Amino acid sequence: MDASFDTDARPAGNVPSVTLDAATARDVRGPSALLALDDEPPPRLIVDPPLAGPVAAGKVFIQYRTENLRVLPVFGAGAMDVSPRVGHVHITVDDATWHFIDASGETVVLVGLAPGPHRVLFELADPIHRVIDRQTVRFTIPE
C-alpha cells in the first residue's frame, strides 16, 4: 500500500514529496483485539518449577506464562468473545478446599508453608471460571 504526500499539499517549510511503502496496522499487529476469532489456537499454561534458592529458605517463587490468552482481571460472560482470549489463574495449595485467583501474570509467591512436601495446582480459567488447562508443581520445603 502506498502512502503519498504530493507537493501541492505540503505544509509550510517546503517539505518534499514522500511516498512510503507501508504495511497496514493489521499486517503488522494482526487482527483487531476487539474481534473474536474462530480459528485461534487453544490457550496453554506453562508453569516453571519454583526457584531452588528461595525454596531452601522456605520461600516459594513460581513463574508461569500463557500462550494464546492474556492474563487480565476481566471477568464475566461479556469477556468470552474478546480476542485474543482473556482469563486468569486459579491457584490451589496442597489439598486446600479453596483457591485464590491470580490475574496479574506475575510470579506467584508463597511463604509460611510448613516443612515437607507440597504441591501447587495452577488452573488456567476463562472469564467465567471454566478451567482450560492445568499444571501441578511439586516441591519440598526443608526442615
Write out the residue ranges for each language-model feature:
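Short amphipathic, basic-aromatic surface patches that mediate peripheral association
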Residues: 48-50, 65-81
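Short, compositionally biased P/S/T/A/G/V-rich stretches that sit at domain boundaries
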Residues: 16-60
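Surface-exposed, short loops/turns at beta-strand junctions within beta-sandwich domains
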Residues: 110-117
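Short beta-strand elements bearing conserved aromatic residues within extracellular beta-rich modules
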Residues: 89-91
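Short beta-strand segments within Ig-like beta-sandwich modules, predominantly Fibronectin type-III
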Residues: 97-105, 111
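Short beta-strand edge segments in extracellular beta-sheet folds
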Residues: 138-142
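Beta-strand-rich extracellular modules
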Residues: 123-127
